[in-house]
């Protein structure tokens, strides 16, 4: 079931470096929220705090709260692995497991979670590949390596792998940056379908993509070089692109900087 995300006074650090300051935002269930902003402004850093992926970097930590339907993901006793099971991640570059078949790539997370019944795994594989709009393209070659697919197909395979464990939220960090225009369009169409089942947050440098796929857009920026990134404003995508409140947002969207 898709869930609501809320951050409260979220500050993010890498050791003594203050990367992002005081982020307060809400992402409603079954919506797509786009994070936009210039390179280095902290949008991917914020994305990774939503499932505690930033913690894999030594010295990284955050203060404030990240809540999933009111439950603090950084609360005492909360298992980071369980968080990442509920809040899936698709990375910038497709990263299928090259030594695994297409089928085994999709069900890898389920196997890690203890599912051993082959019938259940086969059903989950088909359901997830259909959910990623990939089933018809690969159903006759499920035992081939995931690395044998094209770049766009590999990214959809990674999406299938992420949704196979039935997360409540799906995070996407520039999922189209390495893809050709046709593959990009396929991913964008898929994002629009995924929000029927999941809460989706996507980082993108492509303004047209943000306008096409998202319901809500958050603009991040730096005060100055060496200063923390910050959330400048968040609003419906229509308002952000037609009538933003902040001049910095308008300047970025119109290409005056960034």
From Swiss-Prot:
Membrane topology note: Peripheral membrane protein
Enzyme Commission code(s) on record: 7.3.2.1
Source species: Cutibacterium acnes (strain DSM 16379 / KPA171202) (Propionibacterium acnes)
GO MF terms held by the record: ATP binding; ATP hydrolysis activity; ATPase-coupled phosphate ion transmembrane transporter activity
Protein keywords: ATP-binding, Cell membrane, Membrane, Nucleotide-binding, Phosphate transport, Translocase, Transport
Binding site for ATP: 37-44
Description of how the protein assembles with itself and partners: The complex is composed of two ATP-binding proteins (PstB), two transmembrane proteins (PstC and PstA) and a solute-binding protein (PstS).
Lineage: Bacteria, Bacillati, Actinomycetota, Actinomycetes, Propionibacteriales
GO CC terms of this entry: plasma membrane
Role noted for this protein: Part of the ABC transporter complex PstSACB involved in phosphate import. Responsible for energy coupling to the transport system.
NCBIfam families registered for this protein in UniProt: 3a0107s01c2
Subcellular location: Cell membrane
Classification via Gene3D superfamilies: P-loop containing nucleotide triphosphate hydrolases (3.40.50.300)
Chemical reaction(s) catalysed: phosphate(out) + ATP + H2O = ADP + 2 phosphate(in) + H(+)
Name of the molecule in the record: Phosphate import ATP-binding protein PstB
Residue ranges annotated for the ABC transporter domain, each copy included: 5-247
